[in-house]
Curated annotation (Swiss-Prot):
InterPro entries: Homeodomain-like_sf, HTH-type_TetR-like_transc_reg, HTH_TetR, Tet_transcr_reg_TetR-rel_C_sf, TetR_C. It holds the Pfam family TetR_C_11. The gene is aqdR. The keyword DNA-binding applies. Signal peptide: none annotated. GO terms for molecular function: DNA-binding transcription factor activity; transcription cis-regulatory region binding. Residues 16-76 form the HTH tetR-type domain. Induction: Up-regulated by PQS. This is HTH-type transcriptional regulator AqdR. SUPFAM superfamilies: Homeodomain-like (SSF46689), Tetracyclin repressor-like, C-terminal domain (SSF48498). It comes from the Bacteria. Residues 39-58 bind DNA. PROSITE patterns: HTH_TETR_2 (PS50977).
Length: 207
């Protein structure tokens, strides 16, 4: 039998507070049961809300999972803006590396790479990566605008290179990610995407 008082409390949860409670509960369920074993009923119980309200807002479990994982990723791996492309990339890579080695980070990576038969899951995965890639690409675009990076640099390729390194460690190597990886990877990448700028400055000084 439903507790009237508890039902009243659930009914009062609305808007941003409702979303925050549900997403926190989703993350907790992922941590406890694994990303493949989370359903609306589990999250509703954990959040203390009506399961129907979850369906009305997110429609499917994959969309709820993506919302929760993307929100947590944005909080744990923000896009830095220090005024230096080298510093921004190194901070981004460092935070990404740390996050990838947490239970939620590992769950996120595995959720977005393991194949599934559900078209909805595939759409949600693509949506997640498009949002994250677009956000991270701003680091390179700002570097271009400041003249730190060659204007012909493929921003997405840079981000994919950094992210790909981290993902390989988590999904294939199964070993701790070296603490030196962010610095080494960023230095290697920047040696290529800043070479034209460096040469142009050298030519200007000689001229």
């Amino acid at each position: 039998m439903t507790d009237p008082e508890h039902s009243g409390q659930r009914a009062q949860v609305r808007g941003a507070r409702f979303r925050e409670r549900v997403l926190d509960a989703t993350i907790a369920c992922i941590t406890e049961a694994g990303v493949d074993n989370v359903g609306f009923a589990d999250v509703a119980r954990k959040a203390g809300v009506n399961g129907v309200s979850l369906y009305r807002r997110w429609k499917t479990v994959p969309r709820l999972l993506i919302d929760a994982l993307l929100t947590r990723t944005q909080a744990e791996v923000p896009i830095p803006d220090t005024g230096s492309v080298h510093r921004d990339l190194e901070i981004f890579a460092t935070e990404l590396t740390k996050f990838a080695q947490t239970p939620i980070g590992t769950a996120l990576i595995r959720f977005t790479v393991v194949s599934a038969d559900s078209p909805e899951v595939d759409v949600s995965r693509r949506e997640f990566w498009m949002q994250r890639l677009t956000a991270a690409e701003e680091i390179i675009e700002r570097g271009k605008n400041r003249g730190e990076v060659d204007s012909s640099t493929d921003s997405r390729l840079v981000v994919l290179t950094l992210g790909g390194l981290v993902h390989i460690y988590v999904t294939h190597l199964g070993t701790d990610i070296p603490t030196s990886l962010p610095h080494q990877a960023v230095s290697l990448i920047l040696s290529g995407v800043t070479s034209g700028v460096t040469q142009a400055r050298t030519n200007a000084q000689m001229g």
